Amino acid sequence: MSGFEQLFAGKLPKLVMFDLDGTLVDSVPDLAVAVDTMLAELGRPIAGLESVRAWVGNGAPVLVRRALANHLDHSGVDDELAEQGLEIFMRAYAQKHEFTVVYPGVRETLKWLQKMGVEMALITNKPERFVAPLLDEMKLGRFFRWIIGGDTMPQKKPDPAALFFVMKMAGVPASQALFVGDSRSDVQAAKAAGVACVALSYGYNHGRPIAEENPAMVIDDLRKLIPGCLDMDAEILLPDINSPSSRESIVVVTRKLWMKVIKALARWRWRA
């Protein structure tokens, strides 16, 4: 039985919200290049791929602080140094994403959901300025009606504000929505919003098994959500959906727009 069939009693959710890094794309190689560039400019030893893989998931400022601390615990990092490091990192990461790849099964799953008329949103802690260019490079942007970056709203995951916002915009209750992610922040945000969460075992969770966070389901391939597609050896052929003739059908939520609706979301503000 597929993931959707198990979670929604044989039906499909009306809305699926996705994380980006570690869920749809493996961006660690490019993030590691930017982190090491930052560390080298500051005269510090480079971190390397595997260290960066353990540090990602909570946004660029936290990643930079962890790199400067060379540890998950970054409480001792000087704020001025962190700001300097963040500026260098952002400049380095903005240059290119040549090593980022889309995970197997992602495009097939997104195409299938689009074909079935399921609304989709992207909610990531990645800084807003990097999200749309990366989605364009990976040819994933056309699948999402709503796109929210880590600095789009005053709160980021694990705060559920972005999930509440998207559900309100879509007119979909939590019982008919799903969040798909790979980290503790994703699971916590989904639980706080009352939304079922499917977690990917291949993503970034600071080196800890994502099953420890008790999501509704853990899978190792997005195609396991699709009815009839549990055989990973079977090729999945889906007709391409024509790209929207106008970008007006895609809503990229920006900080300016968010400030107009923040009062409407205030009653949903999560209290930790």
UniProtKB/Swiss-Prot annotation:
UniProt keyword Hydrolase present: yes
Gene Ontology biological process terms in this record: carbohydrate metabolic process; DNA repair; glycolate biosynthetic process
Gene Ontology terms: cellular component: cytosol
Catalytic activity: 2-phosphoglycolate + H2O = glycolate + phosphate
Recorded metabolic or biological pathway in which this protein acts: Organic acid metabolism; glycolate biosynthesis; glycolate from 2-phosphoglycolate: step 1/1
SUPFAM superfamilies linked: HAD-like
CDD domains associated with the record: HAD_PGPase
Domain of life of the native organism: Bacteria
Cofactor: Mg(2+)
Listed Pfam families: HAD_2 (PF13419)
Cross-referenced InterPro entries: HAD-like_hydrolase_sf (IPR050155), HAD-like_sf (IPR036412), HAD-SF_hydro_IA (IPR006439), HAD_2 (IPR041492), HAD_sf (IPR023214), PGP-like_dom2 (IPR023198), PGPase_prok (IPR037512)
Transmembrane segments: none
Enzyme class label: hydrolase
One term of GO molecular function: metal ion binding
Record EC number: 3.1.3.18
Keywords: Carbohydrate metabolism, Hydrolase, Magnesium, Metal-binding
Residues annotated to bind Mg(2+): D19, D21, D182
NCBIfam families linked to this entry: HAD-SF-IA-v1, HAD-SF-IA-v3, PGP_bact, PRK13222.1-2, PRK13223.1
Role description: Specifically catalyzes the dephosphorylation of 2-phosphoglycolate. Is involved in the dissimilation of the intracellular 2-phosphoglycolate formed during the DNA repair of 3'-phosphoglycolate ends, a major class of DNA lesions induced by oxidative stress.
Protein name (record): Phosphoglycolate phosphatase
Species annotation: Pseudomonas savastanoi pv. phaseolicola (strain 1448A / Race 6) (Pseudomonas syringae pv. phaseolicola (strain 1448A / Race 6))
Origin organism lineage: Bacteria, Pseudomonadati, Pseudomonadota, Gammaproteobacteria, Pseudomonadales
